């Protein structure tokens, strides 16, 4: 390798260790799985043309699936197990393909269609390795990764005196990570086996919450504000049913870290968190007098419904909502018209209703409701403490998914797509693992 470099062939010299690393990852797909999870927290897209970008996690995903296929062939495995989520995923994929064929601009539809296929492959990978590695272990690592990103966010936010919003290395992906991970950490805290564990997961929840504060993002905070009370309600219901824990005890466990976080923010509201409170105040005012992003969402939702009514079967094509101002030129006359260009519908259901028509919409609704139903059933079963942690975490994360598809920017592309695959894959793996235990 050194000789090649000295001979004036540095590219060949670099290619050798790179080839060794790739070969090692191909032969060790379990390690590649962990690398994929870590790479989700690095937002570093490389643009190829005007409509395509490759992310580090996409490259790792390619290596993971190549390794899975290689392992499958070398071990001569036969048959594939299917979960309750495979059918709606496949129907959603078919709907996107059909919408691509009839798209307003097919060049904008190719990449989003590939994205759905990649999400499905990621779901299958998580489903498989969730059973091998363990669902609880994967969730635990996920919580730590989100908390570390949150720690980076709040540290840099304080360092800058609260002057700028900080998202960290995950960039906007932190919104999806944080709004799922904080309630999951709260679930782990509720069913912790020791005081040490309660302090640990309570600390992780606070760190993730501080990370949200540093971003000043309103969507994740709203999601958490909905999810945590629901978690307490269903936890109390489960505890009463199993007669093993009082409601007051559950409330105290959540109450302490929640009050600590809220008190800290309010203590510094006139200094470090001035910008944060002004953004949230603007959101509350917009509920009665829509303006800013609230008004924009109303316009986008109305436009999505209008688009569906004109194209009910195939939609305007996956990935084509960003061109909706070309389809309806009158949108350019609206006050917030400039912000419509290149936007999603900021409602995943309406977005897919507009882009893929009724079939894609129903597939996504079915997938969401199946996820919620299966997660609730798993959560309400009488389980061991560690299994309770995983089941409760998946249930509340699925609640967050079902709620936020109504108002968040994206769930089916970028890092959000991989988190979606992670949640459904872990849920399928958890269900499969419980069924195997029951048979034994």
What function would you assign to each model-found segment?
Residues 287-302, 314-356:
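Long extracytoplasmic/lumenal interhelical loops at the membrane interface
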Residues 357-368:
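Hydrophobic alpha-helical transmembrane segments
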Residues 7-11, 51-60, 111-113, 167-181, ...:
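Membrane-interface micro-motifs in multi-pass membrane enzymes
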Residues 242-250, 264-303, 323, 340:
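Flexible juxtamembrane loops connecting transmembrane helices in multi-pass membrane enzymes
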Residues 1, 17-22, 65, 90-101, ...:
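Alpha-helical transmembrane segments of multi-pass inner-membrane proteins
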Residues 228-229, 367-370, 392-440:
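Transmembrane alpha-helices of multi-pass inner-membrane enzymes
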Residues 7-8, 25-28, 210-217, 353-356, ...:
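Transmembrane helix irregularities
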Residues 1-97, 129-140, 190-199, 243-253, ...:
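Transmembrane signal-anchor hairpin modules in multi-pass inner-membrane enzymes, especially those
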